[in-house]
Every structure is written in C-alpha cells, then in structure tokens.
Design a protein with these regions (language model features):
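Extracytoplasmic
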Residues: 36-197
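N-terminal Rossmann-fold NAD(P) dinucleotide-binding loop
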Residues: 213
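Conserved N-terminal/central alpha/beta ligand/cofactor-binding core
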Residues: 225-226, 231-308, 353, 376-384
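Flavin (FAD/FMN)-binding glycine-rich loop and adjacent Rossmann-like elements that form
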Residues: 191-198, 239, 301, 313-316, ...
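Aromatic pocket-lining residues of Rossmann-like dinucleotide-binding sites
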Residues: 220
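Beta1/beta-strand and adjacent pyrophosphate-binding region of the FAD-binding site
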Residues: 198-210
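Bacterial Sec-dependent N-terminal signal peptides
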Residues: 1-36
Length: 637
C-alpha cells in the first residue's frame, strides 16, 4: 500500500497537520537538525477561540503548509482575534511570528501590518512588513508573569495582513523550521497528530462541496447510498457561494435526459448576477438540502490532503479539520473528485492534463499551434454601494502606479476582473489572489482620492471584495474518453452521453491593452465564444482512466482545454454531479467499478437519468444566465 502526500516536499510519515496550542518541556529533535531541551509554546492562529474580524484562508495550504488568519477588512480595521494559552512556566520568552509581507513584490511599503497582544498589551513590534515569502519573524523578548495568557492579533491597516502561527521559546537559537517538512514534523510531535486518524466508513465519499459535489452527494444519498461530503470551506456552493459570488450559468432539463437538472433547480439560487449582495447566493438553501438527507454526512471546514491507495484504487482519503487540525480517515469503495483542482486524483497518481494542448494533439481548430501553459484565470470580484454621505478610503502608498488612463471608473468588478492566466493555478494561487486584491485596492484608492472626476465616487463605499478567488481551470483528470471541440461542434454523439453541455465554448484570454499597460501582468480578460448545440457529456469523461474507483464532476473532468470552455459552467457541473451520484448507486447495487458501470450497467444508469433525483414539482427558477445556443439561430432561420 502506498501513501501519497499532497505536497511533494512532505515525507510519508509527516502528514501536514495544524496545531492548536502546545506546551512542550523536554527533548525534541526535528528536521533543522537541532536537538535540545526546549521550553516552548506554539500557537496556530486558525485555532484561535475568537476569530474577531479575521478569516481562515486555506487556499494555499498545500503550498505554504497551513491555513492562516487573514485580516480582510477592505481598508477598515478588523476586530482582534484572540485565544487563551497555558504556558509551562513563567519567565522571559523569545517570540517568533510566521507571516509574510504580501505586497512586497509590488512595493517597498507594506500593506498588511499587525501586532501581537499579550494579556491586552500590544507589543511594539509590527509584523507583515518584512519578508515577501512566509517566514518566522522575531518579535523580541516578552515577559510572561501568569501561566494563563491571552494572545491576540491586532490589525493595523485593514488590508489583508496574515499570520500563520506564533512561537514562544526560552531556548537559545530555537527558531522553528520554515520548510513544510520541518513544520509538519514539529506540529505532529507537539500535538501527537501522527496518531492514527479517526476512521469513518461510507459507500461513497465526495470531495468538494461546489455545485458539482453537492449535487453528486445529494443524488447518491437519495438513491440509498451512504455518502460523506467533504468541503474545505465553511459554506457550500464553491464559486456560487457568497464567498466568491458567481451566478449559475448554462441550461438544464435538456434532451436526451430532460429530468437532469431538477436537482440544480431545487438547490440553486433563484436570482442571477455576479458580485451581488450575499443573500443572492442562498448558502443556507444548499446547506438545508444537504442536511435534509439522512444518508448524507457533511464535513465542512475539512481539507483532504492525504490518501492511501492499493492496486490502482483509493482505499481512503484523509482530511484535516481547518481549525483543530484533527484528522479523519474516510474509507469507501468509491470516491468522487469534485475539488475543481483534481486534488484527489493528483494525490492518487491519476493521469491529468493542464494548460492548452497543441492543435495537432486533438486536431481542434481553436487550439493553439503549440502547447503552452495558458489557462483561464481567477476572478477577484468586488462591488461598491452608494451611501447618503461621503465616505473616505485610504490614499494607499503601497499600491501599483495608477493614473486616469489606467483607471476603471466603475463600481463593480465582474467576471472579467480576472488574473493569473499563464500562472500555475495550484502553486501560485496566493500570488494570483493577492494581485487581484492589489489592483482592486489601487484602482479604488485612485478613484476616491486622485481621479479627475473623483466627485462621482465620493458617496461610494467599497462594500465587498472577494478573498476567495473564483477559479476556472487547473488540472483535468484523464478518463477513458477525452472530450474535445470536434465532437461537440460536429455533434458526434457517443453512446454513453449523459448531462448536456449547452454554454458556448467560452475561452478567456488576457485583455491585450490591459496586458500592455500593466507590464505583462493583466487583471482584465476577454472572452471568445463559439455557440454550440447542446452536447451530452460521455460518461467515460466522468471517471479516471487509471484510478479504478475514482469518478469526477465539475471542471476537472476528462476534456481538452477547448472543450472545458463549455462544460465548466456550474449548472452543467451540477448535472454531472447528479449523474455521478446515480452511477454511485449503480456501482453499489452491482458491486461494480465506474468502468464496469459503463461496460455492463449503463442501461441502469440511463433509467436513473431519465427519472432524475430532483423535485420536478418545483417552479422553474433557473431561467437566468442560460446562454445562447445554435438552437435559437436554427429557430430564427
């Protein structure tokens, strides 16, 4: 049996886990090579009792090693985060804080500054001002007069200061390790997190709680399958949640299986619009639908980052609680990767594709002549609201150079506030999101303080800026069939068609003018559309070619980059999930793996697709952002 870690730098016996509050007296040896008697306390910030106005950000934990707290105040100071700690003894300690100066690559003036408080007293050292990369920064010496201590994080700017952990030590030269391997070993040793995780047994485990994963879990549960749904955010919906605020798109209830999509209609929001107020996205509606299913167990705030495999099958997925660091193992005969990033498939060694394939690879007319790493980007959306009296916004000195010519005199950043195209969507997620933030702040600060027509914006208040990026593309797991532009545009129907994809082939590219003005780092995009007739996605695109018990739904299915342009829409992903949940039922009833469902039991799956699992009696509310197809052009002719 092989154990695959989510980070290549982590050894098998060092799964990346988070710590709560630890006191250690005694001998400890870790990867820095230091072996000494230490008297130390380590505090992981995401485990703070009170988060105040700080948010847990897990988007880059597979790269930098940890969730962390983020002071995302959009220019307004956020309330302190705090926790209570028991020290092993009184005395003088050295303090180290793991943090980074997030805008250092763009300015020598830091944006996200904060202080550490001890029993209500703020220590003078300011953090978030030094290293561009995550590192331990010395906070000097602190005196602990009481064993019971309150530790707090105090925001100084409201502009996304961030803190991973705080370390107190009495020993000389006891600087904690900064590499992921050393940090993992330190945390595991201090908390005993290398102990065997709690075991859970299910028929079907779905990882990823976006529309695709949520529909997959509900679909299977309604068909009698015992399901676990693992989601690494506090809400369901993914890009359609109030954290990202992208509205649903594409069509449902299409031939050859018009009942597919009733589930999307049942749990999806009734209003459209990107970057709208929170209630538009109806997070509670999705949550209530999941909680109503007796066969479905939901694990919010759990990040799957380790698996076990045997004989090209996943045996278990291990996920950690983002706040407590507790690990749980999920055993099942069948899994679904609905993470978007293809995380579970990647950990299992599944074949995958990324970037753009060359034209010769699939003979796609829209593909580039040469393969490259260009992908569609991440959107950091935002909007303002008009208020009755003038409202200030800081005239930031750390933003990008701006001018009237560079500015966008608007009050909302929609899908086309998109960046990161050409970057690594996994390894550079934090950079991409941060660049999305700095351009929003730079533009808004300029409009409020220096724009020629700034009077137009004096009563505009920056209401919301996403700190969770809306991602479109990263890994695509390879199935027994790779769907391409050719089948879709030529209407080459395959015998295992399932959920129809109806949106245009919608591919995004950097806006050339924006690219030039901002020296090759565009944050605005354009979309090029090719209308299609709806096309049923082959079932063979919904399971892995080489991991025998892994299915997938959403943007990580087996398609070319060009074909992804149509299948990636969330209503389509929801229908994929509905099909994958049905396939899990067929698999359970026949003790069959996904490939065998295609080969031997597809007729059973067809019957389920004809019936659907959603409530067909509900009013149809998914009539916004449906997109145009060639069907309308045919009607006009």
């Amino acid at each position: 049996m092989k154990v695959y870690q989510r980070n290549e730098n982590i050894k098998i016996n060092c799964p990346n886990m988070k710590t709560l509050v630890i006191a250690l007296i005694g001998l400890l040896c870790y990867t820095t090579g230091i072996s000494q008697n230490r008297n130390a306390v380590l505090i992981e910030t995401e485990s703070f009792d009170k988060k105040g106005g700080w948010f847990i950000d897990q988007q880059s934990m597979d790269v930098m090693g940890s969730p962390y707290l983020l002071a995302h105040g959009m220019g307004k100071l956020v309330a302190d985060a705090s926790t209570k700690v028991t020290f092993p003894e009184k005395g003088t300690y050295k303090m180290y804080v793991r943090t980074r100066n997030w805008n250092a690559q763009w300015s020598n003036k830091p944006a996200g500054k904060f202080q550490v408080g001890i029993n209500g007293v703020l220590y003078p050292k300011t953090f978030g001002v030094k290293d561009q990369n995550w590192n331990w920064v010395s906070g000097g010496k602190v005196k602990i007069d009481d064993l019971n201590v309150e530790i707090s994080l105090h925001d100084l700017t409201g502009f996304d200061g961030r803190c991973d952990a705080i370390y107190f030590t009495k020993e000389k030269n006891d600087i904690p390790p900064n590499n992921n391997e050393g940090l993992d070993m330190l945390r595991n040793e201090l908390l005993g997190l290398n102990k065997k995780p709690k075991e859970n047994d299910f028929d079907f485990v779905v990882i990823g709680g976006g529309m695709a994963g949520t529909c997959a879990a509900i679909s299977a549960a309604r068909l009698g399958v015992k399901v676990a749904l693992i989601q690494n955010r506090p809400v369901l919906g993914g890009n359609n949640s109030s954290e990202v605020r992208v509205h649903l798109g594409a069509r449902i209830n299409l031939e050859p299986y018009p009942a597919l999509g009733n589930l999307v209609n049942e749990i999806g929001p009734g209003r459209g619009g990107n970057a709208q107020p929170k209630d538009y996205y109806e997070d509670d509606k999705k949550l209530k639908a999941v909680l109503a299913e007796p066969n479905l167990t939901l694990f919010l705030n759990h990040h799957a980052n380790q698996i076990e495999t045997k004989d090209n099958r996943i045996v278990k997925v291990i996920a950690q609680n983002l706040e407590t660091g507790e690990r749980q193992a999920f055993n099942a005969p069948l899994f679904a990767d609905c993470t978007g990033d293809g995380t579970i498939g990647y950990l299992a060694g599944a074949e995958f594709m990324s970037g753009r394939e060359s034209r010769s690879m699939f003979n796609e007319p829209t593909a580039p002549e040469e393969a490259d790493n260009l992908t569609m980007g991440i959107s950091v959306q935002w909007f303002s609201e008009k208020v009755e009296t003038p409202v200030d916004f800081p005239d930031i000195e750390w933003g990008l150079p701006w001018s009237d010519e560079k500015s966008f005199a608007i009050t909302k950043g929609d899908w086309d506030w998109e960046t990161g195209m050409g970057k690594d969507m996994i390894k550079e997620t934090e950079f991409i999101r941060d660049y999305g933030l700095i351009v929003v702040y730079s533009n808004w600060s300029y409009l409020k303080n220096n724009y020629t027509n700034k009077e137009k914006f004096k009563n505009e208040k920056l209401k919301w800026v996403a700190y969770i990026g809306g991602k479109r593309e990263s890994r695509r797991l390879v199935g027994d069939y790779i769907l391409t532009e050719n089948e879709i545009r030529n209407q080459e129907m395959l015998p295992d068609g399932t959920a129809p994809s109806s949106w245009t082939i919608d591919l995004h590219y950097p806006d050339e003018e924006n690219l030039e003005k901002f020296e090759g780092e565009a944050f605005r995009s354009i979309a090029k559309h090719i209308k299609i007739y709806p096309y049923p996605i082959p079932f063979r695109c919904l399971y892995s070619k080489n991991i025998n018990n892994l299915m997938m739904a959403g943007r990580d299915i087996s398609v070319s980059h060009v074909a992804l342009g149509t299948v990636r829409l969330m209503r389509t992903g929801g229908m994929m999930g509905e099909v994958v949940g049905m396939a899990a039922s067929v698999s359970k009833n026949n003790n069959a793996e996904p490939r065998e469902v295609y080969q031997n039991y597809f007729a059973e799956l067809e019957k389920l697709m004809q019936k659907g699992v959603g409530d067909a009696s509900l009013p149809f509310i998914q009539n916004y952002n449906e997109g145009g197809t060639l069907m309308e052009i045919q009607k006009v002719k």
